[in-house]
Structure formats: C-alpha cells, structure tokens
Amino acid sequence: MSISNLILVLIGIAIAFLFTAAAESTTANNNEEKETQWSDIEYLIDANNDTMVNYKNLFGLNIGKVYNPNFVDDADWFLGSSNYEDHIGYYLIPYNYNWHFYSNISAPWYGCEAQSKAMLVTAKKYNETGDPKYLEFSKKVFNGLNSSVINHDGWLLGLVSKNKNATILNSQMFCVANLMTYYEYTGDERALTLFKKGVDVLEKNINDLSGNCGTYYSLSKNRLVSVKQHPEYMKMLERLYLMTGSEMLKNTLYKWQHDYLTCR
C-alpha cells in the first residue's frame, strides 16, 4: 500500500507510514537496496533473502535496521521463535521495535496487518508444500487475529499496544480482504465468518468515515486523509466490493473516485 509523501504530525500518521511505505519502493535483486521516495529509509535484503527496513534516524527515532513483518514474504521467517509469540492457542506477530514519534508505542506492539500477512504467507506455503507445520502455524496466527486482542466485534485493530489501540480504516479494509484469501487457501469457515463480520462493520461505518474530499484515518476521526492518498484506498475498497458485491461499498467507491477527480 502506498501513501503520498507528507509530513507526519500525528501518531496516526506515523502508524500509517509504517504500514504503507513498502509499496512505494521497488524490489532489487540479491543484496541490493530497494529504492524509496523517502530519502531517509532503505529496504534491504538480508542473507536469507528476507526484507529488512532501515529506518536510520527517521524523525530522530534511531530505529535502524529492523524486520517489519508487514514486508516479509518468507514463511520460515515467521516460524522463527523470535518472530511470533505463543499465547496458548494463538500466536501474535509482534513489531519488535519502539515507535516514539508523537506517541509512546514500545515494543512489542501488534496489528491486524502483521497477523494477516503471516497468516497468508504460511497458508500459501502449506498449499505449495503440503507440510502440515505451515498450516498449523497459519491457523494459530488466524486464532490471534480472531482473538479479543485484535478482533473487537469485527473491527480488526490496526494498532495494539500497551498504551494505545487504534481502529484504522485502511487496515480494516486490508485485513478483511485478506481473510477471504485465507479462506480460499484453507477452507476455514471461521475465516469466512470473520470476513462477513468485518464487511458488516465497514458497511456500518464507512459513510461516517468518508468526509468531504477525504476519509478519516480511524474511528477517532482526528485526522482526515487527503484524496491524494485515495488511489490505494480505492484499490482496497474495490477489492472488497468485487469480493462481496455490496451496494454500500460500491456507492462509497464511486464517491471516493468522484472526490479524487474533483477535489485535487
């Protein structure tokens, strides 16, 4: 998911940046760095061909090189003992770095995007290999997504931390759509049930989160996302509309498309 280059001044913007920066970059082969329009960030490939993010001294945070699970495509990386937490019956996929820009988010913190990424990558690996360890892992990650930690009555939290939780519109769209893909991989009816609940939540809230020439970033409605960022939002919403045939989502998609053409 890509987001236009903008000055991040709120915690919501900071979190949005973490979740969406990768799509702005282009992948390079072997150990070459990835290019990004944010000059202070690099996407690197480690010796195992896994993506690392070098945040350097972004916003003075001194995060340096870390693994952001949103950007990892290697099922075996997720199975590494330091990359998931076993909570007896479900797994959580942590972000193992602090994010203290206009916030107090200390590691570990969590969100539905990391959960759904790990869930899909390992389910896909199971389909490719038939190795049951990947299916078992994927199911426990789904259990984490469906747990009360992240699933709040159909809202799949985009941020879960000790001091702050956030219901984020683009995270909801992304994670709900991933549930349908997971269902297609596994046939797990629980995923289909949660998908339907997540769509219902979107249908009930998306009008309220659609403002004039923008959308509200989260239920807190403390930030309006500019229509300049809507191409990626529209792609996610269109994906959900094609999955559901929902008239509500279709009408909202048309509104966003109209706003994008007229409000810039």
What are the residue ranges of the model-derived segments?
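Charge-dense, low-complexity intrinsically disordered segments
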Residues: 132, 189, 224-227, 247
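Long, well-ordered core segments of solenoidal/helical folds
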Residues: 30-48, 67-92, 135-155, 190-214, ...
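N-terminal Sec-pathway targeting helices
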Residues: 1-11
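Well-ordered alpha-helical segments within folded domains of soluble proteins
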Residues: 48-71, 109-127, 167-183, 224-242
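Carbohydrate-binding/catalytic loop surfaces
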Residues: 32-50, 87-110, 153-171, 210-236
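N-terminal accessory/assembly segment that mediates macromolecular interactions
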Residues: 63-67, 74-117
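Eukaryote-skewed repeat-based solenoidal scaffolds used as protein-protein interaction platforms
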Residues: 94-95, 105-205
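Terminal, non-catalytic domain-edge segments
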Residues: 14, 19, 23-66, 185, ...
